A protein has these predicted regions:
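N-terminal amphipathic/basic-hydrophobic helices that include classical n-h-c signal peptides
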Residues: 1-9
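Accessory terminal helices/loops
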Residues: 195-209
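Flexible gly/pro-rich beta->alpha loop and the following alpha-helix that scaffold active-site loops
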Residues: 14-20, 24-90, 94-95, 101, ...
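Intrinsically disordered, low-complexity serine/threonine-rich segments
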Residues: 7, 65, 118-120
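Pocket-forming structural segment of enzyme catalytic cores
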Residues: 50, 74-90, 95-190, 194-198
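Residue-level detector of intrinsically disordered, flexible termini
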Residues: 1-2, 155, 201
Length: 209
């Protein structure tokens, strides 16, 4: 089981973490999960100019119907990835993140749909902290990451998809191929909770400087 010691205090000024809508069918579930965790959150269209974003503590790049493995485009997500805040990419957001930083995302040889088993790799990193080594997640993808970028490591894998999760060495960029926001993902709430904790620690670090 992965271990990540963290804290965040929602009695203080709430964290501001927005969800970038890439056209995913479950984007509102990501927003609701953040609301449940007492985060100040909005759903933002992925065409929104960078200068129109609020002052954010973190961003989630949602999944979507876009075939990132084939087109390599996802609204203004490239500009958002330049921000110095923690970012979590889900499904298409994960694939785009990998491509943006020099990895490879393309069509899956074995697309996955429905409940699947994944195994944590390399300790699972921060997002999988407190979750089981083997767990059930909800998949819905035709494309996948085939190679993580330099400076990233694999955090989870399944028999048919070797990169179900990734994290950079700095610990502020995270990608998940599956959908933690769907109820069938066994530890989805814990994953969002862990991302919120990362955002809190990043804000605390900036405030102390």
């Amino acid at each position: 089981m992965a271990v990540f010691h963290h804290r965040y205090n929602m009695s203080e000024v709430p964290l501001v973490i927005d969800v970038i809508d890439n056209g995913g069918q479950w984007t509102h579930r990501e927003w609701r999960m953040l609301r449940y965790l007492k985060v100040d959150t909005q759903i933002i269209e992925n065409s929104t100019p960078l200068e129109d974003l609020r002052k954010l503590d973190g961003i989630i790049l949602s999944g979507g119907a876009a075939r990132v493995g084939l087109t390599g485009e996802l609204g203004n997500c490239a500009a958002y990835l330049e921000l110095d805040i923690p970012i979590l990419g889900i499904c298409a957001g994960h694939q785009f993140m990998a491509r943006f930083y020099g990895g490879d995302a393309r069509e899956s040889p074995a697309p996955e749909f429905g409940a699947m088993q994944i195994e944590l790799q390399n300790g699972g990193g921060k997002i999988f902290a407190g979750t089981n080594q083997s767990q059930t997640v909800w998949e819905s993808h035709n494309d996948e990451v085939h190679q993580v970028p330099k400076g990233f490591f694999i955090t989870a894998a399944s028999p048919s998809c070797k990169i179900q999760g990734m994290e950079n060495e700095k610990g502020d960029r995270f990608g998940l191929q599956f959908h933690p926001e769907v109820n069938d993902s066994e530890f989805g709430k814990e994953m969002f909770d862990n991302f919120v904790a990362v955002c809190q620690e990043a804000r605390d670090g900036k405030d102390s400087n």
